[in-house]
Amino acid sequence: MTVDVKKVINHKIKPIEYNLTRKDVALYAISLGCGKKHLKFVYEGSDNFSALPTLGVIFPGQMIVDVISEGIDGIEFDPMMLLHGEQELEILNEIPVEGVFVTESKITNLYDKGKGALLILQCITSEKSSGKPIFKNIFSFFIRGIGGFGGDRGPNEKPIQIPKDRAPDAISKQATSEDQAVIYRLAGGDLNPLHIDPEMSKIGGFEVPILHGLCTYGIASRGVLEHFCDNDPSRLKSIKTRFTKHVYPGETIETEMWKINPTTILFQSKTNRDGSYVLSSGVAIIEPIKKGSL
């Protein structure tokens, strides 16, 4: 199979608009397990109603579906061979709880990993009325079976080293419901049938429909927000992780967190199924507590 890296990187992606409502903000929080104990995230009438920072991952959703279904110049692949490898979200400005947003996207790199290819997609989401950028997403997708085309292997980044000489500074446990993926697919905008249709999940090699990786990502970020940001969304500046294994709805996600310095939190997440880690090499950058704020 011929791969033309230049054509892939030059592939044009149309900007997309997203009309965000307060209801969307609340529903997204509910899809990550928030409830009546978290009114600032689920009740639009709350005086300090706020969006969870990882709301930023939902805006490029439809664009990604369109790109995968319509195809990418310079490369051919079976969408079933595409895996979401890593996710990085940077919060650039204060998050509005409603309004029209525009997401502009581009493919920045395609790396040859031998057994597959690593596609890097960058998305900038801005508030339409002001033009102010709010979120920057970097999606890393591994496409199985199309490597070996002689391309650049990409940077040799070493995995984040989680401290082994001390226990986590905080542990967050979040039980998911058996219907978690049913809710998240509507709130998070990922309508992939793999997460709801038993027949499609079997084709994908899973016993039952699996939970969205970005739902697990959002749940882990809630742990960081609660334990190190006092549930203040404005203090979470970026969060990045690697997806290492799937989660089945109904399992409990346990996120272990270490504070490395005033602004850096390392984390990893596992489930109660067999103790395997489902998120690894997690890094969150936070704003430290200002002196005199306590």
From Swiss-Prot:
Enzyme Commission no: 4.2.1.119
Pfam families (alphabetical): MaoC_dehydratas, MFE-2_hydrat-2_N
Subcellular localization: Peroxisome
Uppermost EC category: lyase
Annotated catalysed reactions: a (3R)-3-hydroxyacyl-CoA = a (2E)-enoyl-CoA + H2O
Residues spanned by motif Microbody targeting signal: 292-294
UniProt domain MaoC-like: residue ranges: 165-269
UniProt keyword Lyase present: yes
Main location group: other
Residues at which (3R)-3-hydroxydecanoyl-CoA binds: 84-85, 113, 190-195, 213, 243
Domain of life: Eukaryota
One GO MF term: enoyl-CoA hydratase activity
One of the GO BP terms on file: fatty acid beta-oxidation
GO cellular component: peroxisome; phagocytic vesicle
Keywords: Lyase, Peroxisome
InterPro entries in the cross-refs: HotDog_dom_sf, MaoC-like_dom, MFE-2_N
Homology family: Belongs to the short-chain dehydrogenases/reductases (SDR) family.
Protein name according to UniProt: Probable enoyl-CoA hydratase 2
